[in-house]
A protein has these predicted regions:
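N-terminal leader/targeting and accessory segments in enzymes
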Residues: 1-83, 87
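Phosphate-binding loop of NTP-binding sites
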Residues: 81-185
Length: 185
């Protein structure tokens, strides 16, 4: 949990606590920041009221809106999301040597082999889920949205991983999910 003032400058932000980051209004819980990213079929600005009704403490937008909670206006919410998530989770990507695997075929196989070759100090993130010596969980997307991705990075770091073998989809590059990352390989 962080104060909103640790993430953004603004009057009164010292009194607002942030519990998490969400881009899906249906998943918002009290204290979350709701980031209004734009997707192929939906513009999350259209779901601000739903997010607020579920307890969003703040909304991040890239156009002027009227709402009953603090609003942070940025140039581009899709580009802002990985920066915000990195900061919220205390820059976990800086503690991982990330090995990114991209391509049409073979990403899962190559990422899995790399993780197994490196051993317990290496996590895996991709089609098979998020996997390390301390957890093994399914995920929805090969490369999740940044609100989830940086949460996973933090979990890998907290579990003792030094390396991460990660499938990187073209969609993730296109959607700015990987903008803030420096790949070692």
């Amino acid at each position: 949990m962080k104060k909103l003032s640790e993430l953004y400058e603004g009057e009164g932000y010292d009194n607002i606590w942030v519990k998490g980051i969400k881009i899906n209004s249906k998943e918002v819980e009290p204290g979350d920041i709701f980031v209004c990213v734009k997707g192929v079929t939906a513009d999350r600005h259209d779901f601000i009221e739903e997010a607020i009704s579920k307890g969003a403490s703040c909304v991040v937008v890239d156009r002027s809106v009227t709402c009953s909670v603090p609003m942070v206006k940025v140039k581009n919410t899709n580009e802002e999301l990985p920066l915000l998530a990195s900061k919220f989770y205390d820059y976990p990507e800086k503690y991982l040597d990330i090995i990114g695997i991209t391509g049409t075929n073979g990403k899962t196989t190559v990422a899995t082999i790399i993780q197994e070759l490196i051993g317990d100090s290496c996590g895996y993130l991709g089609t098979n889920g998020i996997i390390c010596s301390k957890f093994n969980e399914s995920i929805r997307n090969t490369t999740p949205d940044s609100d989830r991705l940086y949460n996973y990075f933090r979990r890998f770091v907290d579990s003792g991983c030094k390396y991460l073998s990660m499938e990187t989809s073209s969609e993730a590059f296109y959607r700015h999910r990987l903008d803030n990352l420096t790949f070692k390989v």
